[in-house]
């Protein structure tokens, strides 16, 4: 039987939620009630699958851990008052920490004036952010399209490449094995995870995948496409594959891909949604090899963990295909004043506090600690790898990875797996993580692995 809509029920639900938003603290009974509500509503109205996922990576199979608020720049507090060091970072959005005061203040100040733009008058913050991004990014990148997420930034990049290359008879895209570029239809066509792709087949035509980090495979693909008349419009790849398991290519790989793109007249699209904004020890990961893409995709940390925003930045030559008709690709909320305020403040904090350099220093410290653990626990850990504050611990099988996440949860450290590699747990904390907190994370990992070894031996 169909359920009839109820205005009274919706009004009561919204009033209850607004009352909750106003609260700063909850007593014990309120916490228990909120936990029950959240679990019920996820099950009945969001997606029960999320509960099972959460259950697999929390202590004792308890999926009732409900986030309440930020504890500090680098910690989260749940409804039971437990504080966790955040080594997941919202999959890479909290580069400047949780509720960074500079970012929050910028958004609050803009909120007091005008939250969203009229769409008809020119909005100053979008102009200022575009100018700032042009100054920040490498090479000839000059014009920015702002959106709301990473997958949208990739969609814009693909459409931009198509618009530029179609008159030249180039329609093919080359992506890489293990890649993750998002889950909208175009971005999913470049993503290389069958689990995400198969339910939505057929995807966009013209996409080919080659092994990541294999420059000869890239050359062969470009050659074959040229021979068959399927000339390549663009190569799209991540400088370091995040969801693929924090996979680093061989030194010189990006430089070699850039040369191949120039040789074959293909555009180079770099997806720095996860690696950008200081995460790897440089503002952008491509700067480790001084590589300059034709199109750059940003999102996640660009909004400072306060507002969602993505960006697609291109050279004037490429972006000029949109000059005659700027409405060829637009979005209602992209580049809104609140998001632009957050992004401007985020860039300011990253530069003022030199957080990319801090990411390199602290990342080296953490990675040294994890590699030492890999040597101590070779029966459990296959490898620790990373660059800057984007790291991964790969285990000998999938189950051990899940167990490690659960044990770290018991140690009050949040970690999680990568979407394309179940054996791998990512370590992606805020760049503001303190040295003391870095040491606590390494100690927690040691305790987690020791407990896991005991469990294996007892079994």
Curated annotation (Swiss-Prot):
Metabolic or biological pathway, per its Swiss-Prot or TrEMBL entry: Amine and polyamine degradation; putrescine degradation; 4-aminobutanal from putrescine (transaminase route): step 1/1
One BP term from GO: L-lysine catabolic process
Catalytic activity: an alkane-alpha,omega-diamine + 2-oxoglutarate = an omega-aminoaldehyde + L-glutamate; putrescine + 2-oxoglutarate = 1-pyrroline + L-glutamate + H2O; cadaverine + 2-oxoglutarate = 5-aminopentanal + L-glutamate
Alphabetized UniProt keyword annotations: Aminotransferase, Pyridoxal phosphate, Transferase
Residues given in the record as pyridoxal 5'-phosphate binding sites: 150-151, 274, 332
Pfam family membership, one: Aminotran_3
Tree of life domain: Bacteria
Coiled coil: none
Known cofactor(s): pyridoxal 5'-phosphate
Keyword Transferase annotated: yes
Modified residues (N6-(pyridoxal phosphate)lysine): 300
One function term, GO molecular function aspect: identical protein binding
Record has Ion transport as a keyword: no
Family label: Belongs to the class-III pyridoxal-phosphate-dependent aminotransferase family. Putrescine aminotransferase subfamily.
Protein name: Putrescine aminotransferase
Native source organism of the sequence: Escherichia coli O8 (strain IAI1)
């Amino acid at each position: 039987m169909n359920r009839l809509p109820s205005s009274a029920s919706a009004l009561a639900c919204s009033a209850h939620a607004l009352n909750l938003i106003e609260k700063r603290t909850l007593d014990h009974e309120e916490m228990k009630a909120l936990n029950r509500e959240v679990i019920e509503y996820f099950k009945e109205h969001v997606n029960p699958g999320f509960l099972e996922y959460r259950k697999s990576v929390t202590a004792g199979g308890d999926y009732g851990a409900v986030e309440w608020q930020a504890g500090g720049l680098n910690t989260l507090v749940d409804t039971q008052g437990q504080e966790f060091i955040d080594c997941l970072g919202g999959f890479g959005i909290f580069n400047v920490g949780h509720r960074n005061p500079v970012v929050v203040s910028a958004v609050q100040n803009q909120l007091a004036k005008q939250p969203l733009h009229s769409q008809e008058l020119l909005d100053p913050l979008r102009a200022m952010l575009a100018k700032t991004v042009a100054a920040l990014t490498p090479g000839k990148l000059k014009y920015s399209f702002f959106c709301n997420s990473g997958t949208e930034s990739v969609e814009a990049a693909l459409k931009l490449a198509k618009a530029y290359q179609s008159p030249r008879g180039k329609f093919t895209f080359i992506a890489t094995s293990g890649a993750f570029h998002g889950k909208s239809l175009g971005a999913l066509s470049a993503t290389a995870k069958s689990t995400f792709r198969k339910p939505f087949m057929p995807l966009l035509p013209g996409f080919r995948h080659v092994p990541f980090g294999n420059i000869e495979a890239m050359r062969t693909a470009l050659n074959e496409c040229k021979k068959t008349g399927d000339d390549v419009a663009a190569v799209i790849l991540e400088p370091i594959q995040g969801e693929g398991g924090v996979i680093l290519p061989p030194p010189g790989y990006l430089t070699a891909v850039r040369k191949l793109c120039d040789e074959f007249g293909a555009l180079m699209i770099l997806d720095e949604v996860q690696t950008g904004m200081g995460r790897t020890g440089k503002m952008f990961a491509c700067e480790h090899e001084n590589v300059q893409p034709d199109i750059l995709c940003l999102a996640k940390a660009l909004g400072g963990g306060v507002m969602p925003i993505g960006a697609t930045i291109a050279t004037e030559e490429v972006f000029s295909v949109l000059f005659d008709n700027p409405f060829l690709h637009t979005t209602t909320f992209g580049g809104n004043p609140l998001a632009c305020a957050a992004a401007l403040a985020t860039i300011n904090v990253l530069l003022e506090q030199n957080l990319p350099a801090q990411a390199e220093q602290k990342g080296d410290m953490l990675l040294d600690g994890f590699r030492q653990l890999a040597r101590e626990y070779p029966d459990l850990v296959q490898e620790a790898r990373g660059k800057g504050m984007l790291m991964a611990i790969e285990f000998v099988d999938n189950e051990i990875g899940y167990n490690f996440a659960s044990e770290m949860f018991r140690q009050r450290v949040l970690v999680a797996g990568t979407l394309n590699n179940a054996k791998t747990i990512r370590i992606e904390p805020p760049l503001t993580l303190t040295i003391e907190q870095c040491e606590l994370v390494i100690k927690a990992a040691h305790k987690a692995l020791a407990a896991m070894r005991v469990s294996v031996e007892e079994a």
